């Protein structure tokens, strides 16, 4: 469970909308949410937070390093809490579902490829676009 101290550590003032949005992102099973999905979840929880406020807060959270914004092809921005753990993504092109995965062999191979070309890996973002086999 995220705490108000997370907002303070990120240099943000503790406000009710920020707390509600941060708590919602932390408690939802859906780790990748658009601003519209955030609004829907907040409304379902009986919270009255406007769309403009959600966009503003998510942008502030991104700037403060609390969330990561992803702009997957063919869709709008989705946000996930920045928990510090590296992972890659698969995006179902038929449903827009985002699946997280981590594969040590893929990570190892990427470092090897970078080293073979005389570089050091600083960061990467791997997104696989997939659909269910028929």
Swiss-Prot record:
Organism domain of life: Bacteria
Source organism (scientific name): Pseudomonas putida (Arthrobacter siderocapsulatus)
CDD domains named in the record: Fur_like
Subcellular localization: Cytoplasm
One of the protein's GO biological processes: negative regulation of siderophore biosynthetic process
Binding-site list for Zn(2+): 32, 80, 89, 100
Subunit structure: Homodimer.
Protein name listed in UniProt: Ferric uptake regulation protein
Chain residue ranges for the region called DNA-binding: 1-83
InterPro entries xref list: FUR, Fur_C, WH-like_DNA-bd_sf, WH_DNA-bd_sf
Residues noted as binding Fe cation in the record, renumbered to the chain: 86, 88, 107, 124
Keyword terms: Cytoplasm, DNA-binding, Iron, Metal-binding, Repressor, Transcription, Transcription regulation, Zinc
NCBIfam families assigned: PRK09462.1
Family named by the database record: Belongs to the Fur family.
